[in-house]
Amino acid sequence: MTVEWLAEQLKEHNIELTETQKQQFQTYYRLLVEWNEKMNLTSITDEHDVYLKHFYDSIAPSFYFDFNQPISICDVGAGAGFPSIPLKIMFPQLKVTIVDSLNKRIQFLNYLASELQLQDVSFIHDRAETFGKGVYRESYDVVTARAVARLSVLSELCLPLVKKGGQFVALKSSKGEEELEEAKFAISVLGGNVTETHTFELPEDAGERQMFIIDKKRQTPKKYPRKPGTPNKTPLLEK
């Protein structure tokens, strides 16, 4: 009944799950657990917890941001595909690119996309710092990341990939406000401007989430992102 639980939760936000989408989520869960036995994809494997803390949590940004349009999305450090694969299942017209530094995860995502019959998805084995210096720099409508690093660090990894006029959608847990304050300098330096913040609770008291929508107002200076590892070691902070 877990996929039916997800359907009920989404219905409260006027989102209807089709039978195809239900089957896709069921397949996603099965493959996630199977592959997780061979490699570390997630510490969450209980079926209900996966639907709540991975699937629902990944779809929740669509309550506050319009993903129902033909936009290109880059998901930085998506791990087992969160949030972009659940979003792709819900909004099939999205063009999704996932960048991840671990090749094993890319292998899983390629197999997953094939089994789910997803079109317009690509998975790239690279560090975000290197990827952001290449041909895809400033080419995406939306770049997203889900709690992979502090916001000051995430901004340097993500904002260089956002096209001018696009958005960086940052998904954080409950300490997001502190991180946002610390990250404002970096966001400004990298050409961004925070335009919306949303705070919401997951169902069943599963925790608070915060979502920041950052508009790309100016081009990112060419020197960013810095070389791999530097953003994490020495984040861009106001001196």
Curated annotation (Swiss-Prot):
Name of the featured protein: Ribosomal RNA small subunit methyltransferase G
GO cellular component, one term: cytosol
Protein role: Specifically methylates the N7 position of guanine in position 535 of 16S rRNA.
Residue segments, region Disordered: 215-239
Protein family (similarity comment): Belongs to the methyltransferase superfamily. RNA methyltransferase RsmG family.
Chain sites annotated for binding S-adenosyl-L-methionine: G77, F82, A128, E129, R146
The keyword Cytoplasm is annotated on this UniProt entry: yes
One function term, GO molecular function aspect: rRNA (guanine-N7-)-methyltransferase activity
Coiled coil: none
Subcellular location: Cytoplasm
Domain of life: Bacteria
Gene3D superfamilies hit by this protein: Vaccinia Virus protein VP39 (3.40.50.150)
Primary location group: cytoplasm
This protein's encoding gene: rsmG
InterPro entries: rRNA_ssu_MeTfrase_G, SAM-dependent_MTases_sf
EC number: 2.1.1.-
Species for this entry: Staphylococcus aureus (strain MRSA252)
UniProt xrefs under HAMAP family: 16SrRNA_methyltr_G
Keyword vocabulary terms for this entry: Cytoplasm, Methyltransferase, rRNA processing, S-adenosyl-L-methionine, Transferase
